[in-house]
Amino acid sequence: MTVQAIAGVSPSSEAVVMTEYPSIAAGGIAQLLGSIYESIPSPAGLPKLSYLFALATAPFGILLYALQKLFGQRYVLTNRAIQGWTARTSRMVSSLNLSDFDRVEVVQSAGQVFYNAADLRFVGANGETLLRLKGVKDAGAFRNAIERTAESRRMVQESLATISARG
């Protein structure tokens, strides 16, 4: 059994905090469908007619979902980085350390509104985009998890530096 000075903190290993699979709103075809769904007006007091149109195009949505699961990505938040992995294989396609970005922005295009999804844009200190996670379902919650994990990482690093400075 390993004793940790700070519960849940391991200075030598990386641990998964959260895994997020993007919605079909990550792709252009689904965003086009989402834009069409949102453009259908809803009569006052009645359910949105766009739900009926979405039901009619459901087989196409299922195909897009299957393709996303086969050939898309998954986003993994660890105690050290945010990573993009291929959905089926264990191949990392992108990574950004939690200390390397300045802020995380939620960018929602018109086609993503119907799916309650958005892109997460990681911005560096100089304003450049360091990483973009496309089509994240409930992006605000995932952004909060990333920001809290990054803040925790920073505080842990400060604590470990203070402890090691004591000698």
Predicted regions and their residues:
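N-terminal basic, Ser/Thr-rich segments that initiate or prime the first beta/alpha elements at protein or domain
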Residues: 1-167
